[in-house]
Design a protein with these regions (language model features):
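Short, polar loop/linker segments at the starts of domains and inter-domain junctions
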Residues: 17-22, 69, 131-134
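N-terminal, Lys/Arg- and Ser/Thr-rich interaction peptides
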Residues: 1-23
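A broad, low-specificity signal marking well-ordered, structured residues that form hydrophobic/aromatic
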Residues: 2, 44, 51, 81, ...
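N-terminal post-signal-peptidase region of extra-cytosolic proteins
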Residues: 21-34
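Extended, low-complexity, intrinsically disordered C-terminal regulatory tails
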Residues: 31-68
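N-terminal compositionally biased, intrinsically disordered segments and leader/signal-like regions
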Residues: 4-6, 46, 104
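Catalytic cores and adjacent binding grooves of peptidoglycan-active enzymes
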Residues: 71-72, 76-134
Length: 134
């Protein structure tokens, strides 16, 4: 299970002035929905691999230093999470189960753009597509 501590990655202590109540609220929703996704995945696949947060909340300096990060990344607002997925199994399962993403209220960055992790967010992208290209 992913916790808010996992999601903040110590950045809540390093950058307290950037962490607003809105970001905290968004982060709580993001973590809750990510845990629902992982619970569904584990229940249906019996995969027990421990999934860690590759990237959670990103303050501006962290986002600017993150390779290939969008200048207005949803991570900066607590609206997105990258979950470790070294073999791509979680991404593949998400691609095969868009109905579960929809039920939970998550949007998936296309796996071809996120090798080694699964990026999900709690708000739709500009395209509105459940699976999107950044």
């Amino acid at each position: 299970m992913i916790t808010l501590t996992d999601y903040f990655m110590g950045r809540d202590k390093q950058y307290p002035d950037e962490l607003t109540e809105e970001i905290r609220s968004n982060a709580a929703e993001t973590v809750a929905k990510a845990n629902l996704l992982l619970s569904s995945y584990r229940m249906l696949t019996k995969d027990e691999e421990i999934r860690k947060v590759n990237s959670g909340w990103r303050p501006a300096l962290i986002n600017a230093a993150t390779p290939n990060a969008a200048p207005r990344s949803k991570h900066m607002l607590g609206l997105a999470i990258d979950i470790s997925d070294p073999e791509g199994d979680l991404d593949e399962w998400c691609m095969d189960n868009p109905d579960i993403l929809q039920t939970i209220g998550l949007w998936l960055e296309h796996p071809s753009c996120s090798k080694g992790w699964t990026h999900v967010q709690i708000v739709p992208p500009k395209s509105g597509k459940r699976v999107f290209y950044p």
